[in-house]
Every structure is written in structure tokens, then in C-alpha cells.
Amino acid sequence: MENLKIPEGYQQIMPYLIVENAAEFLNFTKNVFGAVERHKTMRTETLIMHAEISIGNCVIMFADATPEHHKQNAGLFIYVDNCDTVYEKGLANGATTVMPPADQSYGRSAGIRDPFDNTWWITSV
């Protein structure tokens, strides 16, 4: 990969999630993590074919599930300024607890499962 070219603003590896109700996933990430919408292509008036958000300097791509493209979930690890605050925002936006905030050897960490079945490991140091 000596001549690898990556478009500006992207990483070499990026998660690509297929979720049910991608528009609600977009709102969840904005409300909980401060995500910024970068791109959105609609399949129909209500279904997202492809979308991208930025959280910090990272990109997550996602789309609505279809009969051809089944739901694909992920476990995501995210550093935040305040684990407890983001954890509470997640719960307020429909997430459930995987692990309540607790001090760990690597920082303060919590786990939530969002309404789309993705697990987010939230950590502040």
C-alpha cells in the first residue's frame, strides 16, 4: 500500500452500519455524540441509501437496511470529554445500559446499546 491515497477527511478504516431507520440513527448520534452530518443520499423520500457523519475527526458511514442489505450492527469505542454526561444523553435518547459508568484502569468508561442495536463503549480519560 505504498501509493495508498485516502480522500481528505476520511480514515483508512471506517465503520459502515446498516440500520433500521437510519434517519433516527442520525438524530441519535447528533443528540448524544454531537455528530455532524457530512453527506446524505436518499433511496426514497424516507430511506437513506448512504450517509456519513463526523464525530471529532472520525467518519461513520451508514444506510437503511433493505431486503438486499440486511442490518449490520457494530461495537464502537469512543473517547469523550465526560463519560457520565454522554452516558446520560444516550439513555435520554433511547439507549439502554450495557455497563454503568465506572472508573477503569484506562479511564472512566460506560457502555450503552443504542435503539439500533449498536453497542457504544464511552470513555473519558
Pin down the residues of each PLM region.
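A short beta-turn/loop motif at secondary-structure boundaries
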Residues: 43-46, 68, 103-104
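N-terminal beta-strand motif that seeds the catalytic metal site of vicinal oxygen chelate
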Residues: 1-26, 74-76, 123-125
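A short alpha-helix capping/helix-coil boundary motif
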Residues: 3-7, 28-30, 64-68
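Core segments of cupin and vicinal oxygen chelate
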Residues: 9, 16-59
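Short, low-complexity Ser/Thr-rich regulatory SLiMs
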Residues: 42, 64-66, 124
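Vicinal oxygen chelate
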Residues: 1-8, 12-20, 49, 51-54, 62, 65-125
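Short alpha-helix boundary/capping motifs
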Residues: 57-59, 81, 118-119
